């Protein structure tokens, strides 16, 4: 299993430094990080990032919380560059799964990064949802799981086996 390191943030200078140094294999950000980083124009920030970072994946998250809004945003974000992955949370704020949305997007060739995965059941659900023909990322929040006092290593080991069916 190859381990890939992704930088999570919204500081353009820091992202470019990490990219130029070859320290990471991809980048990801989210609305909270962008707000904390002082980003006021999401599209402009994303397009600036994508002008400079073209050879590794960059994940941008949807802001909407409802399925229709997420889908519209995801379809737009996916047009920004070939190396873009659209981050979709595993659950919305009502606790509803986004697996059906992920399945549609992935089937349509949109690269997704399913984020905030915490359970083996979610891993199963989203391994089933993504297309084997479209690259995808499943982001299991091992650090947050560990913060609750639960050892995330068994989940990670089992998840590696499960995702192997869709490399």
Regions found by a protein language model. Give the residues of each.
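Active-site beta->alpha loop and helix N-cap motifs at the rims of alpha/beta catalytic domains
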Residues: 2-16, 20-24, 28-111, 137, ...
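Catalytic alpha/beta core domains of metabolic enzymes, predominantly
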Residues: 103, 110-167
């Amino acid at each position: 299993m190859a381990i890939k390191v992704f930088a999570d943030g919204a500081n353009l200078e820091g992202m470019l430094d990490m990219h130029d140094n070859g320290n990471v294999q991809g980048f990801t950000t989210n609305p909270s990080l962008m707000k904390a980083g002082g980003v006021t124009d999401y599209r402009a920030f994303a397009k600036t990032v994508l002008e400079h970072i073209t050879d590794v994946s960059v994940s941008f998250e949807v802001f909407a919380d409802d399925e229709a809004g997420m889908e519209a945003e995801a379809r737009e974000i996916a047009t920004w560059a070939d190396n873009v992955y659209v981050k979709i949370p595993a659950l919305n704020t009502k606790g509803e799964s986004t697996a059906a949305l992920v399945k549609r997007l992935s089937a349509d060739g949109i690269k997704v990064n399913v984020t905030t995965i915490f359970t083996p059941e979610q891993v199963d659900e989203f391994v089933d949802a993504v297309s084997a023909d479209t690259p995808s990322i499943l982001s299991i929040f091992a650090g947050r799981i560990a913060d609750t006092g639960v050892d995330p290593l068994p989940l990670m080991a089992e998840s590696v086996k499960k995702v192997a069916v869709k490399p």
